[in-house]
Amino acid sequence: MALLIEDKKQIVAEVSEIASTAFAAVVADYQGLTVEQLTTLRVEARKLGVATRVVRNTLAKRALQDTPFSILNDDLVGPTILAFSTSEDDMGAAARLFEEFAKTNKVFELKAAAFEGKLYQGADVSVIANLPNQEKALTMLASVLQAPVSKLGRLITALKEKNESEAA
């Protein structure tokens, strides 16, 4: 069914709005998936705060034109689903979602991802998928900051014990 020009403009505006506030975008080939599998993917995406959209490639190119994700234009070929990480707390959510989905659905193929103006293609998408969410990042930072303090504490305890043993 052909889309009316008004419908096309609305789709471009919607995708462009999502892209303008997103932190990362991922493009994948969904050819061969069943409706149930795509529905499962979309449900999981909503749970994670990831915006997914199946759009005609020409409309997607127009929507991404003035965004940092325009670098994905060359990968907008064939059946394409877009995912945008819109949460500041978890910028790698879209890539992580698609990567996990691809593990269980072999026909689902990751094409590319864009993050902070850089293009990641194929297997390199895992770089974004492995980004920690905000909670994990803060935990990692706390453990890094805690390590020198605990070493200092052990050193002071060892010196104290050494001085006590020498005094006795």
From Swiss-Prot:
Superkingdom, natural source: Bacteria
Underlying gene: rplJ
Subunit structure: Part of the ribosomal stalk of the 50S ribosomal subunit. The N-terminus interacts with L11 and the large rRNA to form the base of the stalk. The C-terminus forms an elongated spine to which L12 dimers bind in a sequential fashion forming a multimeric L10(L12)X complex.
Gene Ontology biological-process entries: translation
Key words of the record: Ribonucleoprotein, Ribosomal protein, RNA-binding, rRNA-binding
Protein role: Forms part of the ribosomal stalk, playing a central role in the interaction of the ribosome with GTP-bound translation factors.
Family: Belongs to the universal ribosomal protein uL10 family.
Name this protein carries in UniProt: Large ribosomal subunit protein uL10
Lineage: Bacteria, Pseudomonadati, Pseudomonadota, Gammaproteobacteria, Moraxellales
